[in-house]
Regions:
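Expand to "…catalyze enediolate/carbanion chemistry for C-C bond making/breaking, isomerization
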Residues: 1-264
Length: 264
C-alpha cells in the first residue's frame, strides 16, 4: 500500500465546514473495545490516558484497532507527558490532546514535542505510523506537521486568561475545553457544573477566540443531547459521553426493558 495522506482527519477538523465531528471517548484499556465502538458512526475515537488506564502498549494497539476499523484515533496524554505525545504519533495517532495547558510556555513545549522542525523538535521514528498509512518516510516527514494535530486543553482559570496567547502559538492546531474542570476552577472549587448557561457563555467566547486565530474548537459533552447542543453552538469536534457511561446505560436499558416486559 502506498499512501498520500495520514487519514484526512486533520484536514476535516481544520476545514470549519465538517458539519461538526462526534468522537467516541474510551478509558477502558482494551484495543478490541476500540474496534467495537469504532464500528458505530463516530467520526473518530479518543483514547484517554489521563484518567483512563491505558499504557503505551495498549494505546498503540488501540490506535491500530481504530485504524483497522477505518477511524482516526486521537489520544489524550497524561498531564505534562510530552514525550508520550511523540511516541503516540509514532504509533499512528492522528492527533494528541494535552491536558492542563495553562500558559504559552506549556503550549510551546507541547508543540515542540509534536511537530518536526521548523515548528518543533519532534524526534524521528514513525515506523508504525508509516505502516498504518502506507506513507513513505519522505512523504510522512513532509506532511506530518499538517496532517497530525496538537490540541491543548483549556480547563483552568490561568488557561482561560491566557487563551489568546496559547492560541497564537505556532504548531498548536486547536483547543479542547474541559468544562468539568473549568467549572470547578471558575467556582474556586465550589461546584461541578459543566452544562450551565454560565458555562455556555464561556464556551461561546472560546469558540470566538478560536475563530479569530484560525484554529478549531473541541469540547467534552456529557451525553448525546449535550453533544448536539455543543455542535449547534459551533464546536468543530465534540465528545458524546464516555465509554463507561455508554456501556452502563446500554446495560441498564436492556435490564429495564426485560423487567418491563416481564411485568406487563
Amino acid at each position: 500500500m502506498v499512501g498520500s495522506t495520514v487519514d484526512g482527519f486533520a484536514e476535516r477538523i481544520r476545514s470549519g465546514n465538517s458539519g461538526g465531528m462526534i468522537s467516541a471517548w474510551i478509558g477502558i484499556p482494551d484495543p478490541l473495545f476500540v474496534n467495537h465502538l469504532a464500528q458505530e458512526a463516530f467520526d473518530a475515537v479518543v483514547l484517554d490516558m489521563q484518567h483512563g488506564v491505558w499504557d503505551m502498549t495498549s494505546a498503540a494497539n488501540g490506535i491500530g484497532q481504530g485504524r483497522l476499523a477505518g477511524k482516526p484515533v486521537v489520544v489524550r496524554i497524561p498531564v505534562g507527558d510530552f514525550a508520550m505525545a511523540s511516541r503516540l504519533l509514532d504509533a499512528g495517532a492522528s492527533g494528541i490532546i494535552a491536558p492542563m495547558i495553562n500558559s504559552v510556555s506549556d503550549a510551546r513545549g507541547f508543540a515542540n514535542a509534536t511537530k518536526y522542525p521548523p515548528l518543533g523538535e519532534r524526534s524521528w521514528g514513525p515506523t508504525l505510523a508509516m505502516n498504518h498509512t502506507g506513507l513513505s518516510a519522505a512523504t510522512y516527514l513532509a506532511t506530518a506537521n499538517i496532517e497530525t494535530v496538537a490540541i491543548a486543553m483549556i480547563e483552568t482559570r490561568a488557561a482561560l486568561d491566557a487563551a489568546d496567547d496559547i492560541l497564537a502559538v505556532d504548531g498548536l492546531d486547536g483547543i479542547f475545553i474541559g468544562p468539568s474542570d473549568l467549572s470547578i476552577a471558575l467556582s474556586d472549587g465550589a461546584r461541578l457544573a459543566p452544562d450551565t448557561p454560565e458555562m455556555d457563555v464561556v464556551l461561546k467566547q472560546l469558540i470566538e477566540r478560536c475563530r479569530a486565530h484560525g484554529k478549531f474548537a473541541c469540547v467534552f459533552g456529557s451525553n448525546g443531547v449535550r453533544a448536539g447542543e455543543l455542535l449547534r453552538m459551533g464546536f468543530d469536534f465534540v465528545i458524546a459521553g464516555a465509554d463507561t457511561q455508554q456501556l452502563r446505560a446500554g446495560a441498564a436499558g436492556a435490564i429495564a426493558a426485560a423487567r418491563k416486559v416481564q411485568s406487563d
